[in-house]
Design a protein with these regions (language model features):
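Conserved coil-to-alpha-helix start sites within the AMP-binding
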Residues: 123-129
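Short beta-strand->loop structural element characteristic of the AMP-binding/adenylate-forming
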Residues: 138-148
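N-terminal "arm"/small-domain region of PLP-dependent enzymes with the aminotransferase-like
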Residues: 1-63
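Catalytic PLP-binding core of fold-type I/II PLP enzymes
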Residues: 153-168, 174-213, 247-250
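Active-site region of PLP-dependent enzymes
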Residues: 200-214, 221-298
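Phosphate-binding glycine-rich loop
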Residues: 67-117, 130-135, 141, 208
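Hydrophobic residues in well-ordered beta-strands that form the structural core
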Residues: 120, 141, 193-195, 227, ...
């Protein structure tokens, strides 16, 4: 037998070594393009390291968020230079979590309520706009410029009303929109800015902050950024997405919406880290009601 007299660790390593060899032999054959060949604009980009990690995770058979999730969130946050990153199952879910975060009662008067307006564009992928419509907010569409297909920032003031609460737009095909103007507009009118960064992971933008020119990654200049890891994007998990922010309160709300609306912030498999799981009062619920099963965002 292939694993006879081997420990589980040794057997696992043997499998992973064979997976790496299989990938290099059958999946990564590189040939030159010939005249008339179809050259895709986007595709899966991977090598044996990704395939080994995929199989390693499968052998562990941990079927929900686990150590690879934790590692990825830390590395992506570090790469982007933000404090918080939350992995979700798709870029569409990332946009949904980002928008729904703005509806939280914890945001007070700045929360988005049904009937409030969100400035965006119609020329783009639908899931940038869909969360607002699904919730009952009103998208206010601004035209785009040609050939960039990004928002025409000169028309922002025309789209503003007393009901405007946020701007949620994408960087089209990796080309950043006019962040200087959009950011200044949002700050002037106390609006939330959500950057759909699904097309622009790794794109950098230079703008003035406190009298200095500062270069940051797109997706980190607004209040919340989102990414997608669907195969046509810069890197892939098959599916997958991420929501990131520097704001601790927004991060708390993002995590709550991601985890069924739960109020408790304890990670999976760990309970009562705060030491107050059973001694709180929640409205008319009995004193000591289990905080782990309190849901503050539904």
């Amino acid at each position: 037998m292939a694993f006879e007299h081997k420990t589980e660790t040794e057997a696992r390593q043997q499998i992973l070594d064979m997976v790496a060899e299989y990938c290099d032999t059958y999946h990564n054959k590189k040939g030159s393009f010939q005249e008339g060949d179809r050259i895709p604009y986007a595709s899966r980009v991977y090598d044996h390291k990704e395939m080994v990690n995929l199989v390693d995770s499968s052998l562990e058979f941990w079927l929900t968020s686990g150590r690879y999730t934790d590692e990825f969130e830390k590395k992506l946050a570090g790469y982007l230079g933000v404090r918080f990153c939350s992995l979700v199952n798709s870029g569409s879910s990332a946009n949904l979590a980002a928008f729904m975060t703005l509806t939280s009662p914890l945001l007070g008067e700045r929360r988005v309520k049904r009937g409030d307006e969100i400035i965006t564009v119609a020329c783009g992928f639908p899931t940038t706009v869909a969360p607002a419509i699904q919730y009952g907010a009103v998208p206010v569409f601004v035209d785009v410029t040609i050939p960039q297909y990004n928002i025409d920032a000169t028309k922002l003031e025309e789209a503003l009303s007393e009901k405007t609460k946020a701007v949620m737009i994408a960087h089209t095909l990796g080309n950043p929109f006019d962040l200087r103007t959009v950011k200044a507009f949002c700050e002037k009118h106390n609006l939330w800015l959500v950057e759909d960064n699904c097309d622009a992971l790794g794109t950098q933008y230079t703008m003035e902050e406190d009298g200095k020119e500062v270069t940051r990654f797109t997706g980190t200049i607004g209040d919340i950024g989102t990414s997608s890891f669907y195969p046509p994007h810069h890197m892939t998990m098959g599916e997958g997405g991420a929501v990131y922010t520097d704001n601790p309160l927004l991060n708390k709300i993002i995590r709550s919406f991601r985890d069924w609306g739960r109020d408790c912030v304890c990670p999976s498999g760990r309970d009562n880290m705060c030491g107050h799981r059973f001694d709180r009062q929640f409205g008319e619920l009995p004193l000591g009601y289990d905080h782990k099963y309190v849901y503050s965002h539904l």
